[in-house]
Amino acid sequence: DGFGWTPMHFWVMQNNYELLELAIKGGANVDMQTLLDPKSEYNETLLFEAVKEAETYRVTQLLIELGANVNFITPTTPLDDAKGSRNKKLLKDAGAMTSAQLDKKYNIYWDSEECEKDESYMEKYCKLLNDAIKKAKESE
């Protein structure tokens, strides 16, 4: 659709982990993003959608098992948005952090005033933090 939603996004919302598993194991991107902001390359992934509802914890578990990035930042993270104790536990067990924890770990500060002055600030912030996380994972 116009927001970049695919059948996979709807399967997440419907808690249809069987079709999601088939699609991802068949080559679909586990970190597929919506296009809520077409100007941004950092929109919510399937995992963000899964953790928004406590009932979709099985989808959350599947996405994590299949390699979803638990620390993707938009500037919030899936853990910031998570509903339900099972989703939060699954994320934490997989190493997920809140955006504040990531900011502190990578010494990157979110400046909301700067964001109001410079529309590209959020994009730059997300890119910097996602790149830092990716490099840290590669060096582990």
Indicate where each model-derived feature is located:
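Substrate-binding/catalytic groove segments of enzymes
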Residues: Y57, V70-F72
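Generic detector of contiguous secondary-structure segments
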Residues: G2-A23, A28-V30
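Ankyrin repeat domain, specifically the short helix-to-loop turn at the C-terminus of the second helix
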Residues: E21-N29, Q61-N69, K92-M97
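Ankyrin-repeat-protein effector appendages
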Residues: L66, K83-E140
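Ankyrin repeat A-helix N-terminal signature
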Residues: F10-N16, E41-Y42, E49-T56, D81-R86
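Ankyrin-repeat boundary/"N-cap" motif
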Residues: D1-M8, Q33-E49, F72-D81, L102-I108
